[in-house]
């Protein structure tokens, strides 16, 4: 768990039972990444509304993965079926047109909390969501793939 937190660029918490994106946790030294990966949005807010707004930035090729985690009902169903974590990866188009790869990891748990509205303890499903910018890893993978393809093409040309 500590390793996941250290690798994360952004962490935020969501009450999946009530559809509330509660807060963003900014890690020391990751303030810039946090601003890049997390939209400027007033908190607390509806998690689903936040995701739908963010979805406008997601590329068509990767939107299916993003949509697996874009609302509380889907995540609660996964949790009720025994899943406690899941990861998806998607591409977000930045304002300057560049593409950023993002890995989103959702860690879910059930907690009993005191509800001040009804003045009683109630079970809630919470998620800690971790975002990691994986653009550099994808660029390295693409460069390695191109290098291997060039070596393969050269080897094929020599064998003719």
Locate predicted features.
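PAS/GAF/H-NOX family sensory domains and closely associated sensor/linker modules
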Residues: 42-82
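Per-ARNT-Sim (PAS) sensory domains and their PAS-associated C-terminal
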Residues: 65-113, 121-125
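Short coil/turn segments at secondary-structure boundaries
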Residues: 26, 68-70, 142-143
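Short beta-strand/turn micro-motifs at beta-sheet edges
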Residues: 39-41, 114-117
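Membrane-proximal linker segments that couple transmembrane helices to downstream signaling/catalytic modules
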Residues: 1-3, 151-160
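Hydrophobic pocket-lining residues within nucleotide cofactor-binding pockets
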Residues: 16, 109, 134
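PAS-family sensory domain signal
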Residues: 1-57
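Sensory coupling linkers of modular signal transduction proteins
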Residues: 116-156
